[in-house]
């Protein structure tokens, strides 16, 4: 019987390594030894202790940040700046053994965006994910509705009272929150209906990107979009029986428009199906892609009850799941048949973890900014290694995110193909302890491999 019962006793090296593999982007042999002496409760609590927020990202061309400045004419091209924002997110994982960075990727996968957004908006979105990495998924869902990057990505900024756009409300329901259930009638997906999408599309009219960044969210202190009541459908919105036929009162002020969003989010997150869908996402991300009827009944349903009763606290859900006997495959007689070693790493996890475990030496970011930021991270790590291995980091093919997290039955096997597998092997061949990184050579694309394929 699958069980959320607390795992007792010290982890030992095997289970400590399992926990670190699932919860971080990388760790060392020293980390394994340290975590081996901890109980699951102690270890997970440590992983949920996050580092302080680092300074904003640096543009190697100027040696300064461009966030919050008016120096665009001095900076690197916008495409490069976006990659330097990703460096800001990921490089901290080399010095911090915590759940933070994996949770930020989880939130990106579940509130998908891409690199068509501006670098400053990308930074603000990652800061938003960082802020709620162990906070309330419900609260975050409301904040994302006003996120400048999301307003652009799913066309909300084009939505008016006269011409509502259905893109964002459709994806919010189907992909970000409650999920689509079995279709039981024309336009009826059990958990919501086409009528609900149309009503929600009217609710999300009139919100505009604020490129001046003067609209500040009081809870996060981050910029957000700008409500425009004159372009908003100010009438009431009534939803289907899937949402108990609730009516949300239309607003005719900035505050009224924001209250409509809060009321809508509250309505969606009042449903048990929303909590269960989010818990399935957590399970597939941290434990295993396969959710059997037993897992649904004994893990997903009780975990969803815990999540919902605690205002969708990700911290409480993570503690419950990652401290459980089930996570360590200790809830049946065979302790090695299902969970441990049962997931294929994405390229980001594989490459970052390999670099950290084997102590691959990276260029010095202080004395050689160009080689560190541009040649290693941008040209080689993001634009070559991860891309050729099947993961365009923070730039999934569509709004559903990376197929390995949702496309059944293959799921995480999708990370591996005849083409992508070769890059995993080639990278591993250059990850020797103390290696300065043959894959750090410049002009990879010009030579075809230049250090990786030799």
What are these regions (language model features)?
Residues 105-113, 279-280, 300-301:
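Cytochrome P450 heme-thiolate monooxygenase catalytic domain
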Residues 99-103, 114-120, 162-164:
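Short, flexible active-site-proximal loops enriched in glycine and acidic residues
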Residues 73, 81-98, 105:
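Structured, charged N-terminal subsegments at the starts of enzyme catalytic cores
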Residues 9-68:
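Hydrophobic alpha-helical membrane-insertion signals
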Residues 12, 27-28, 52, 94-103, ...:
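Short, solvent-exposed loop/edge-beta patches enriched in aromatic
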Residues 1-3, 36-39, 48, 55, ...:
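Active-site substrate-binding loop specific to GH73 endo-beta-N-acetylglucosaminidase modules
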Residues 5-13, 17-28, 271-310, 318-454:
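Flexible, low-complexity segments enriched for small/polar residues
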């Amino acid at each position: 019987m699958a069980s959320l019962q607390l795992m007792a006793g010290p982890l030992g090296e095997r289970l400590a390594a399992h926990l670190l593999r699932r919860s971080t982007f990388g760790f060392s042999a020293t980390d394994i030894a340290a975590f081996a002496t901890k109980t699951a409760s102690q270890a997970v609590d440590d992983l949920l202790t996050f580092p302080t927020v680092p300074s904003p990202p640096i543009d190697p061309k100027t040696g300064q940040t461009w966030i919050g400045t008016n120096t665009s004419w001095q900076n690197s091209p916008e495409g490069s700046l976006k990659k330097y924002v990703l460096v800001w997110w990921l490089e901290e994982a080399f010095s911090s053994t915590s759940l933070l960075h994996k949770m930020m990727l989880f939130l990106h996968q579940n509130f998908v965006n891409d690199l068509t957004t501006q670098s400053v908006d990308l930074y603000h979105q990652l800061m938003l994910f960082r802020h709620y990495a162990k906070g309330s998924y419900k609260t975050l869902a409301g904040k994302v509705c006003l996120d400048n990057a999301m307003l652009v990505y799913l066309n909300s900024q084009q939505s008016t009272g006269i011409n509502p756009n259905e893109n964002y409300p459709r994806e919010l329901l189907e992909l970000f929150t409650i999920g689509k259930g079995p279709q039981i009638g024309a336009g009826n997906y059990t958990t919501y209906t086409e009528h609900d999408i149309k009503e929600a599309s009217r609710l999300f009219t009139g919100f505009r990107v604020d490129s001046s960044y003067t609209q500040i969210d009081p809870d996060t202190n981050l910029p957000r979009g700008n409500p425009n009541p004159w372009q908003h459908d100010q009438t009431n919105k009534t939803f289907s029986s899937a949402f108990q036929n609730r009516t949300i009162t239309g607003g005719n002020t900035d505050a009224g428009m924001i209250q409509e969003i809060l009321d809508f989010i509250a309505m969606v997150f009042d449903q048990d199906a929303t909590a269960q869908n989010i818990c399935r996402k957590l399970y597939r991300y941290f434990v295993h892609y396969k959710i059997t009827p037993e897992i649904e009944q004994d893990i997903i349903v009780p975990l969803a009850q815990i999540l919902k009763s605690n205002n969708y606290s990700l911290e409480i859900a993570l503690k419950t799941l990652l401290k459980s006997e089930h996570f360590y495959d200790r809830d049946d007689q065979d302790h090695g048949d299902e969970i441990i070693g049962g997931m294929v790493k994405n390229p980001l996890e594989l490459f970052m973890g390999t670099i950290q475990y084997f102590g691959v030496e990276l260029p010095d970011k202080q004395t050689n900014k160009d080689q560190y930021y541009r040649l290693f991270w941008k040209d080689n790590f993001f634009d070559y290694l991860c891309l050729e291995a099947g993961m365009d980091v923070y730039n999934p093919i569509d709004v559903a995110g990376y197929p390995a997290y949702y496309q059944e039955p293959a799921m995480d096997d999708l990370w591996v193909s005849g083409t992508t597998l070769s890059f995993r092997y080639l990278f591993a061949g250059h990850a020797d302890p103390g290696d300065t990184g043959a894959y750090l050579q410049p002009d990879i694309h010009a030579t075809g491999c230049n250090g990786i394929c030799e």
